[in-house]
């Protein structure tokens, strides 16, 4: 199984004073030798947080994805991309994980799955090794003008966490 000393964990996103300390503590508990990179926004209060490397990013803001007369819907995809990418630049370990700052580990069992089911076809390989995530699902969040005409986004990768070789996540 993969040793925690070979893992960089990029904790990305806004700091929640209640959940983020729990998130960091859970990483120390279940991945005790992992490198923790906290990647958040400039001007954020990061006092009393346990991390190894700090990355303070300029907040790119949200993206408007739908607008109706009574409601606007925004997406944080640019924030996730910036904070994850900048955190990965500081990662020094063979494996990397992108983790939202409000998630809490309850085990390290995800590591058991990284090298399971290694058979794969060569025609469709994008990465050196597979990337683990918690779920792939379908979203209906692309603006097309009318709510009834929303476009399906199949195989949308969850923003909760990703794990793989650092070179693949880069």
Locate each region found by the language model:
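Active-site-proximal specificity loops/subdomain of glycosyltransferases
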Residues: 39-90
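Short loop->beta transition adjacent to catalytic acidic/histidine clusters or analogous donor-positioning motifs
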Residues: 5-7, 28-38, 52-53
